[in-house]
Structures are given as C-alpha cells and as structure tokens.
UniProtKB/Swiss-Prot annotation:
Monomer. HAMAP family: DNApol_IV (MF_01113). Keywords: Cytoplasm, DNA damage, DNA repair, DNA replication, DNA-binding, DNA-directed DNA polymerase, Magnesium, Metal-binding, Mutator protein, Nucleotidyltransferase, Transferase. GO terms for molecular function: damaged DNA binding; DNA-directed DNA polymerase activity; magnesium ion binding. Residues 7-188 form the UmuC domain. The keyword Transferase applies. Poorly processive, error-prone DNA polymerase involved in untargeted mutagenesis. Copies undamaged DNA at stalled replication forks, which arise in vivo from mismatched or misaligned primer ends. These misaligned primers can be extended by PolIV. Exhibits no 3'-5' exonuclease (proofreading) activity. May be involved in translesional synthesis, in conjunction with the beta clamp from PolIII. It holds the Pfam family IMS_C. Coiled coil: none annotated. It catalyses: DNA(n) + a 2'-deoxyribonucleoside 5'-triphosphate = DNA(n+1) + diphosphate. This is DNA polymerase IV. NCBIfam families: PRK02406.1 (NF002677). The gene is dinB.
Amino acid sequence: MTKLRKIIHIDMDYFFAQVEEKANPSLKDKPFAVGGTNPKRGVISTCNYIAREYGVRSAMPTAIAMQKCPNLILLNTDFAKYKAASAVIRDIFYYFTDKVEPLSLDEAYLDVTDVKEYKNSATLIAQAIKQEIFNKTGLTGSAGVAPNKLLAKIASDINKPNGLYVVTPKQVDSFVKDLPVKKLFGVGKVSQEKLKSMGVETCLDLQQLSLATLVDKFGKFGSSLYNYARGIDNREVNPVRIRKSVSVENTYLEDLKTLGACLEKLPSLYDKLTSRMTEEHYKSIIGIVVKFTDTKFNKTSLTRVAKILDKEMLKNLIIELHQKRNHPIRLIGIGVKLGEIDDKQMDLF
C-alpha cells in the first residue's frame, strides 16, 4: 500500500507589496503597487489588496492600472529587501523539515509526511509555520495542505490572504470535480483553449475523456492530465530541486513595432525573472536566452553562454534578434539556462 503523503504549499501574500508595507506602515491603508513606475510603459509587478479592489492586477500595464485607480502609489522594486525577507522565511521552513522545495522568493512546497511533532498533523504544522513567519517577519502567507503537490498549491490560493485550506484524502474526489482545468499544473492558455474546444472546462469534464484520447491529443502531457483530473499527482517534493531553466514571457496587447518599444519591456521582464530566481539559480547559470514571437506567430530565439544574469547582454540579444525580424513583435521571453548542458541544447522555451 502506498504511503499517503502530507504536503504543504506556502505562498506569501502579495509578497513584494507586503514587504514594502511592513517597511513603510503609512502605505497600509492606501492603494499601491510595486514596479511599473514608468506610467506610460511600465508593468505592475504586484499590488496590495486595496489596489486590487479597484481592479489593479499583477502584470497589468501601469497606464491601465492608473485609469482604474488614479490615486495609485507606485514604488520601485527593491529585490535586496525581498531576498532578505525570503531568506528568513526559508530558514523557518527548514526548521520544520529538510524536505523543502523552493519555487521562488515567496513560495515553496514542504513534505511533512515524516514530521513527528505537532501530532504528525500537517494542518497543525502549517498553522505553526504561518505563525512563526508572522512572528519573525510580520508578514502573512497562505497555506494549502493536501496529499500531493497539485492539490496543495491549488488549496493555498483558496482563502487568501492569510488563509489555510486543507484537502484530506477523503475529500479529493469531491474537491477536484468542480475545479476549472486552468487550475491544473501545466495547463496554460493554449491547453485551456484546446480543452475548451473539446467541451472540457472542469475536471469532471476531463474525467470523461479516456487516457488514449488525451495522449493522442496532448502527447505525454495527456497522461498527466488524466491523473490530475482525478487529483492524482506523484511528483515528489524535491529538496535538491534542479531546474534546467527559469524563464518569463509576456504577450502584449499592442504590437511592438520598433526596437525601442521592445527594449522598454526589458526592465519589467527582468524584474519578473529575478523574482522567480533563488540563490541556487544564480550560482548555476550557464546561459541566457531571448525569444520573440511575431504577429504571424513565428518564433525566434537567441542564446549566449553566460555565468551571470547580465541585463546588458539581454539588451544586446534583443537588439540582435530584432534585426532578424521583419514583423511587429507580439511576445517577448527572457530566461536563464541552469546546470551543465551543451550550448546547442539551450532551448528554454
């Protein structure tokens, strides 16, 4: 019989903005956002919940955010501050278990299956972690507790902010049936639209499709979809998690018709990329890459061997790549390649 696992996913609430709020309490009752300080070309990194009440969201162009909330306060990103807070939080995770898989500065998976303290209750452990984070940093985070990573991550988003949601093994079937398929790991806009064209919008809909059909339509990922629709996820929490790459991309509502327009997007993409990187990622960089998709959906990318994340090199790659394209740009992606791998295999996207 397979041993039931106890997985916790911790996701800090509006992390960058919350850190800024803690540093400057006068912001607490005001709508504010981090990043996107250029009102014409900027993009919001994150915002507090007061700003969200006005409709402001992460990745929203600053111009639109200011239309929705004219009195929105814009702050520059301060990654040194965010990384310092993240280091304290991560130390707390390791106090409770060695099985920690960081995903970014503000979220991680923890496997507490073998933790004997707190009556071996994942719920009590999650409560203790949240309390310890608050005691040491003054920050709140939300936790999801479930038998696997898939469900724990989904659960952590349910009662935000400062939430805790538990999915017990007996609740898995009822929990997943009404879940939108877009909540499933690996389902992006393309997969979501493809599933929708097949009449699939919820996990219950997805359960009606055979394994053979899903593999035929989605290849290897079809097998994962088949399991995810049933709340099954066998991925382990990997405490020595080795990522082959970290990348970000953005699709723009208005086509980028000039090199200058493309270069103006680099700062926000760079901030977004660095926010997803841990200290371990920085130590194992072997290359950087830039990708374009034009208005005719042609994809082009360039890579360079590099040991550091160099914004100037990214800028030069954008310039070089732009010279190869004859059409306006719809999407820009940037990223780093990690680990020891042949340069010819540097395809992040």
